[in-house]
Amino acid sequence: MSTRAQEILLPPQSNIMRVVFLYVAQGDATLFFIPSGGRHLTMLIDSNQGRKHGGINLVELLQDLFEGQANGSLTYYVNTHPHLDHAGGLDEIQDAIEIDNVWHSGHDPGRNHCEAYDALQRLRKKVTDKGGEDRTLTGTRSTELLGEAVYNVLSPAQHVQDEIADEDPEVRYRRIHEHCAVLRIGYGAPVPAFVLITGDSDKCAWQEHITEYHGAGDENRIWSQILSASHHGSRTFFKTSEDDPEPYTRHMDLIKPENLIISAPLQEESCHGHPHDDALELYKKYISEDAIFHTGDGRRSFICDIYSDGRFFINDDGGELAEHYGFPPDDEDGGGGKEERSKSTGPYVISQIDRKPMG
């Protein structure tokens, strides 16, 4: 009998790249299923154990996802930067499932901000001890292959890594979002559909290091149909502060996104007020309101299926994953009820946002 995670998450065909933006409350976790020779590579970009506001318990979900599967391990864990809302629960995850390879930004935040960083170091050692890949992501002009997908590492640039590494710990920590990994992953031919994963990358990162270098030359490597909103819909993608008189939007001119995914709880539930109203207004200048998808709205996870010809659909799970795997309101320590919840109890039908191809 399949688990609910398998029913909802596993792609129905081997020639579909599936991208799942999971509801993890105040944090990020994006799961990729990447076609590769008749099977799928799996990649989890960032993680958060959103115990408040019913976030999905990633440990239970991932255990159920890989239970009884021939490919019973996570092929890649990718960390855009070592903040707890992007590397939360990492010790629990690596104890619960096998992780073959790890990619990361190479940021060392210093001893006063080391909890997520230390968990990442433990994973790096565990992976390398088994002969897996431990890769520090560095921005490059190259387009690389991953299974049957293509990808670009857009950030951090080598000179940014070197410069920030020479700073004292507190300055390094303040610049962590400038040092954030940014990746674009695409699938389909002749023109791939691209998903742009931005982590918490900020105005400085885009204005000073990413946009012109990767977007304004002969090849636009930031153009993407699906944009994951940076920093949970924070204004920091556009502004240095709320009263910044010169919001930066050049990156949006070149990304040209058709769809936006915001990973955050409801604004009134967010400890930072995400997504920020002024950021939403800027996004709406480029993206129609009905193509802006917010995980906090109904505690939904959004599922993007990209086909081999580049067409794609974005659907949602109707909040089913959060209902089935979400932390209960009184859960303080991340316990859960996997034994009571993990098995499927009936057929599952995904909610269609729009049955017409979106790309």
Question: Regions from the language model: what does each represent?
Answer:
Residues 26-29, 57-62, 88, 209-216, ...:
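Alpha-helical scaffolding within the catalytic cores
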Residues 20, 31, 43-44, 184, ...:
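Conserved beta-strand elements of the Class I
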Residues 24, 45-50, 82, 107, ...:
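Active-site metal-binding loops of divalent metal-dependent hydrolases
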Residues 2-19, 24, 64, 69-76, ...:
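Flexible, acidic/histidine-containing loops and adjacent segments that form or flank the divalent-metal
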Residues 109, 219-303:
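Long, structured stretches of catalytic cores involved in phosphate-ester chemistry, encompassing
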Residues 35, 39-43, 48-104, 215-235, ...:
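Active-site metal-binding motif and surrounding structural segment of the metallo-beta-lactamase
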Residues 26-28, 179, 223:
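Beta-rich catalytic cores
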Residues 28-29, 52, 86, 111, ...:
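Flexible loop/turn segments at secondary-structure boundaries
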